[in-house]
Design a protein with these regions (language model features):
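Buried hydrophobic packing residues in well-ordered domains
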Residues: 64, 118, 141-142, 165
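A structural signal for short loop-to-beta-strand junctions that line the ligand-binding cleft
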Residues: 100-119, 150
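Extracytoplasmic/luminal low-complexity segments enriched in Pro/Gly and acidic/polar residues
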Residues: 158-174
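N-terminal targeting/tethering segments
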Residues: 1-107
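Acidic/polar surface patches and capping/hinge elements
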Residues: 101, 124-158, 173
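A short glycine/proline-enriched turn/edge-strand or helix-cap micro-motif
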Residues: 62, 114-129
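Intrinsically disordered, low-complexity, Lys/Arg-biased terminal tails
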Residues: 67-68, 100, 117, 125, ...
Length: 174
């Protein structure tokens, strides 16, 4: 609905603004969104990015529902989980119990947290589609760039980098 669209627009607005400023050397002013950038108005670019964000969020939640990680993939259910999480945290604070993380999540932070958790759940379950990797996939990713850990300037060998390489391949496939 319009509430979901507005939220997603708010999520992408800053990044879109920065992208337009950088790509078109544009200055941010009152008419920024009404300006034309190579034949497309700023508000159209913002709308396109908003729709892409909505599609991504729906894909994540539809997959999570399909896998049984959430029982309801709707925006309303997400909003309810956010409210429930904050109520639970507030109750613990009132009782003097220890809570980890924030006392209260903004909707955007909760969305980021939940998407990150769902992605991690999916990627860590090797029985899920695409998560069992071939040695060729791991090797291709490893050879695509340097793998440097800590203060060491040298490229790590595959066995040292394997966990990170496998995580990256799974996240790309996700």
């Amino acid at each position: 609905g319009s509430k979901e669209y507005q939220l997603c627009m708010d999520l992408v607005k800053y990044d879109v603004k920065m992208e337009i400023q950088k790509r078109y050397d544009a200055l941010y002013g009152e008419d920024f969104w009404e300006q034309s950038y190579e034949g497309q108005y700023g508000y159209e670019i913002l709308a396109d990015h908003t729709v892409e964000k909505i599609k991504y969020i729906h894909a994540v939640y539809d997959l999570a529902k399909e896998c049984g990680d959430v029982s309801d993939s709707s925006y309303e259910a997400l909003e309810q989980r956010w409210k429930d999480e904050n109520a639970e945290r507030s109750e613990k604070v009132a009782k003097g119990e220890v809570i980890y993380g924030l006392k209260e999540y903004t909707f955007q932070l909760y969305l980021d947290y939940e998407i990150s958790t769902l992605k991690e759940q999916y990627c860590n379950d090797l029985t899920r589609e695409g998560m069992k990797l071939t040695e060729a996939e791991v090797l291709e990713c490893y050879e695509s760039r340097d793998w440097i850990f800590g203060g060491n300037e040298e490229n790590a060998d595959l066995e040292t980098a394997r966990v990170a390489v496998e995580r990256e391949v799974r996240e790309q496939k996700y």
